[in-house]
Amino acid sequence: MFCATIAPLYSTDFGYLMPEKILIAVAWPYANGWLHIGHIAGCYLPADIFARYHRLKGNSVLMVSGSDQHGTPVTIRADQEGTTPEEVVEKYHLSFLETWDNLGISFDLFTKTGTSNHRETTHEIFNTLLRKGYIYKKIMTVPYCEHDARFLPDRYVKGICPNCDNQDARGDQCDNCGHPMNASELGNLTCRLCNQQISIRDSEHCFLSLSKFESDLKTWLSDKDGWRPNVLNFTRKFLDSGLKDRAITRDIQWGIDVPMQGFENKRIYVWFEA
């Protein structure tokens, strides 16, 4: 998956079309495993072809992406390999760079979410939304493993999806139907680390008021007839079912810190910051 923004520039003095500015924003791979042919065929090769085409036309192209280094995908891999999240992301980030070089994928910038600039930008966005009233605190129920004595965010739990009955849904989304959810909504909750039943505890988190954007998003979407039908229908389905406010912090120690007092032991949810 990649997004492209095209900005044509016209010369008012000579009346001809000047080179366009093309921004190609390519999906960020999680730095928790090796790339495979599906990654390349799915987004990186198409994006590279698009970039090369516009460079040949003489346009100014900026193709960017980076390693998604935070969240439970990385910490679970570290648990599996008996190492640290830092070592995991460094290993796989370097492997990504080697892959792009071997395949000739022509990124202008391939960065990572572990930079100080990314942290500062995330904090700036978080604080702006907080100041404007789009972020609020609320106590929610969170899975907790008594055996491992730890909270279990997102991919640390599995259970039955309430939307499609998939038996192996994750704690933040069902990969079978794409339905986003809180982990406590799953049926038959089980810890992925020890495969034991888990309990539910209260934990305070920050929520993003997605519901406040629903009306404006529907208006914005109303004239997007040029989108592919499946993309348009998928987006409309979420809006028609009603946007729900989502927790954007997690009980985890790996990730970007939350710029709020009382949240020192939590981190910003990877989908918010990446």
Region locations from a protein language model:
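Short, positively charged and aromatic/hydrophobic N-terminal segments
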Residues: 5-16
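N-terminal Rossmann-like or analogous alpha/beta NTP/dinucleotide-binding catalytic cores
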Residues: 19-138, 149-150, 162, 226
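Structured secondary-structure scaffolds
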Residues: 19-65, 117-121, 190-274
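Residues on a specific face of well-ordered alpha-helices
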Residues: 48, 72, 94, 159, ...
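Generic secondary-structure signature for well-ordered alpha-helical cores
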Residues: 101, 131-134, 179, 196, ...
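Internal, well-ordered alpha-helical segments in soluble enzyme and binding-protein domains
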Residues: 125, 157-160, 170-173, 213, ...
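Cys/His-rich short segments
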Residues: 134-205
